[in-house]
Amino acid sequence: MSLFVAVDNIDKVFSLTDGGEYIALKGINLEIKKGEFVSLIGHSGCGKSTLLNMIAGLDLPSEGIVTLEGQRIKQPGPDKMVIFQNYSLLPWLTVKQNIALAVDEVMKGASAAERKAIVEEHINLVGLGHAVDKRPGELSGGMKQRVAIARALAIRPKLLLLDEPFGALDALTRGNLQEQLMRICEQYQVTAVMVTHDVDEAVLLSDRIVMLTNGPGSNIGGILEVDIPRPRKRMEVVEHPSYYSLRSEIIYFLNQQKRIKKLRAKKTTAIARHGLEKVNLELGYVPLVACAPLVVAQEKGFFAKHGLDEVSLVRETSWRGIVDGIAGGYLDGAQMPAGMPTWLTAGGYREQSIPVVSALTMTRNGNAITLSKKLYDQGIYTAEDFRQLLLASDGDRHTLGMVHPSSMHNLLLRYWLAAHNINPDRDVHLKTIPPAQMVADLKAGTIDGYCVSEPWNLRASMEGAGFSIATDLEIWQNHPGKVLGVREDWAIAHPNTHVALVKALLEACAYCADPNHEMEIRELLATRQYLSTNIDYIHLGDPEGRTCRLGNPVEYSHHLFFGDQFNRPSRTEHLWMMTQMARWGDIPFPRNWVEILERVCRVGVFSTAARELGYDVNYQRQPIALFDGKVFNADDPIAYLNQTVIHRNFTIAEVHLDNPTPAPVFA
């Protein structure tokens, strides 16, 4: 498909009656290929119809241009046909006459017989042969919309534009018309752009779904590729492995936009007290056993002890929620996968650098690679068994879940696969899934396995859904798991608060490491407020240090919360994670990697906090030892990258970092 429509960096500004301005759209860039069906989705007021009107030529952008086949769109015309929700039929004309009026006006060069044939063809196309002589007042809403579709297609437009065409129809009629439109677009390779509020409609009809953020200044928050093959049938679409992940992706985006709107309206003023710049903090977490230090700091009073007496823990269902909260400035800090501060700083989020610092490693270990019971029943007990299965699969796709590109789950899973000569980008399909969804997807058969933190490996085993083929003790013992992350500008604006936060969480980590507190912490985590799960699935660690065995219904977590060199941020470890993210194309490897590590790893903040608590600080650099015996050379990371056998075509580039400045006083 060739480029057909180009929306080039457009803004749309409306003048207000009081002399002010309203910025509806800001910096919209979109390319549409010939024959592609693109849906625009977002909340009311996000500018969907405004964008559609500019593509139609019904309105002009304030800045930027829109082109059709390389020609600038300046006005409406029959090459760009719009179907509105309200049909726009002439009430005194019949079905046939409404369509014929458009055909006669546009196709004056065709003979009367040719025009008549075109009208009849499109009446039959939408199934209205029995109603050709009826006027709009005699038709149902669905029939009227079919007339509008037939009229639009009959004049052979280059581009079909639909503004919520089925929004006013009942569910049955809407479903039938969606099927008809889908069939027509597939048959005639129609290029279409549709505005919709209906998530299922967008997934069913689209090749791509463009998600718009809230206004004012709405922009494209994400574009989803719909990888469901055509021709499509509704019941086959809902059974496709991608259907529910696409649907949940859109719903997550829409819910997140609602939340952002509320947070914008809230604008909590920072409360300074106890010598701290801010005591009312919003800290994000994902419900995992690894969130124990945050829960303990809140419930056992460590936050309050260090002056942070108005802390709110914000529960997110996925790491993407944490990313959005940090990127948007709606969270003061968060529990993060160990690689996320580096990923954000190096431009992993929408290819823009968001400097994030980490002054505390809160957990180590706690991960495992789980495969389905179906694979176990097929005799897949080792990585080599799995590799042989893939070699014999004859093109069958095997999907493995992970939680985020920057997570140790993704990096360790990829490392484990590659070390066993399995290409994680070619031989399997890696899919980002929220942790709490892993077991359900494993049971449903939409994935073959995953790498995730507890309690989801233990739960899969206890419920007979899967088994752990490897734990982190067998891949990289004592690797960093979760860290505390805050934006760099926030840390600069709140230096005393930052130290107090690290002190509170470091004390909480020590509390979690005491075996005498395990049952108390398990009970706290199991409550509805936090993990909301059966306490039997929650274990902080196994004092005997056992790893899982195949067929053993009880598998153990190996979290380490506190100990010598366990909590200090390590530049060497962050460098290893940086090389792995570059290896798999999630970030370019930064030429200025030393600068990035210095900006990310705030050893000084950790040292201050630890010493004020009376803890010793060990600065000795530890070697990184993974199961395959490969040595990580922290002095020459590019040489290390070049020595990897399986990798993507990684790039090396300077990552531009702005000079650090304090965050605004509003959270």
Swiss-Prot record:
Biological process (GO), any one: monoatomic ion transport
Ligand binding (ATP): 42-49
Induction (record text): By carbon dioxide-limited conditions, probably via CmpR.
GO cellular component: plasma membrane
InterPro entries the record matches: AAA+_ATPase, ABC_SmlMolc_Importer, ABC_transporter-like_ATP-bd, ABC_transporter-like_CS, NO3_transporter_ATP-bd-like, NrtA/CpmA_ABC-bd_dom, P-loop_NTPase
Membrane topology: Peripheral membrane protein
Primary localization class, coarse: membrane
Key words, A-Z: ATP-binding, Cell inner membrane, Cell membrane, Ion transport, Membrane, Nucleotide-binding, Translocase, Transport
Location in or out of the cell: Cell inner membrane
Region described as CmpA-like: 281-667
The EC number(s) this enzyme carries: 7.6.2.-
Keyword hit for ATP-binding: yes
Domain ABC transporter: start-end pairs: 5-239
A Pfam family reported for this protein in Swiss-Prot or TrEMBL: NMT1_2
A GO MF term: ATP binding
Subunit architecture: The complex is composed of two ATP-binding proteins (CmpC and CmpD), a transmembrane protein (CmpB) and a solute-binding protein (CmpA).
Role played: Part of the ABC transporter complex CmpABCD involved in bicarbonate transport. Responsible for energy coupling to the transport system.
Family from the record: Belongs to the ABC transporter superfamily. Nitrate/nitrite/cyanate uptake transporter (NitT) (TC 3.A.1.16) family.
Name recorded for this polypeptide: Bicarbonate transport ATP-binding protein CmpC
Taxon lineage: Bacteria, Bacillati, Cyanobacteriota, Cyanophyceae, Synechococcales
